Amino acid sequence: MLLHSKILGDSENHILILHGFLGSGDNWITIGRKLNFKGFTIHLIDQRNHGRSYHSENFDYQLMSNDLLKYIKHHKIKDPILIGHSMGGKTVMKFSLEFPKLVRKLFVLDISPKEYPIHHQSIIDSLELSLIHIS
């Protein structure tokens, strides 16, 4: 399956923006529009299990890196600039380590390249309980 995105512009120079946990590409629309005016094609990507992209029980950075590779190949993007915020930063770091020749530039925002313990599980559990009560 292919990740959902909003694409702004039609330049040969592509910037792919990946949002943080519980976000979507829409979080970056204002910045995306400004970068588009600078002559770039902007891809505001909804990562797996977020926004309008597909949802799966499988969820890790290896899978998200592979999702990004499929997206880049599908859209025939050459030498993209990658911007990743928080969880998106981890995704683009993983991707860049695996496919360094496919990346022109990398910008990682609000996360560092280290191991983080799982700490969002209580939020996810609460959201699942809320959905059960709504149903």
Where are these regions (language model features)?
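Short, conserved structural micro-motifs that define repeat-unit consensus positions
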Residues: 19-26, 47-50, 58-59, 82-94
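Conserved HGGG/HGGXW glycine-rich cap/lid loop of the alpha/beta-hydrolase fold
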Residues: 7-54
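Active-site loop/oxyanion-hole signature of alpha/beta-hydrolase fold enzymes
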Residues: 37, 43-83
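Conserved small/polar residues in nucleotide/adenosyl-binding loops
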Residues: 132-134
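Short aromatic-enriched loop/helix-cap "lid" or pocket-rim segments at secondary-structure transitions
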Residues: 55-57, 117-121
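Short, hydrophobic alpha-helix immediately C-terminal to the catalytic nucleophile
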Residues: 29, 69, 93-97
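A short loop-to-beta-strand scaffold at the N-terminal edge of the catalytic core in hydrolase folds
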Residues: 1-7
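Conserved hydrolase catalytic core segment
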Residues: 78-117
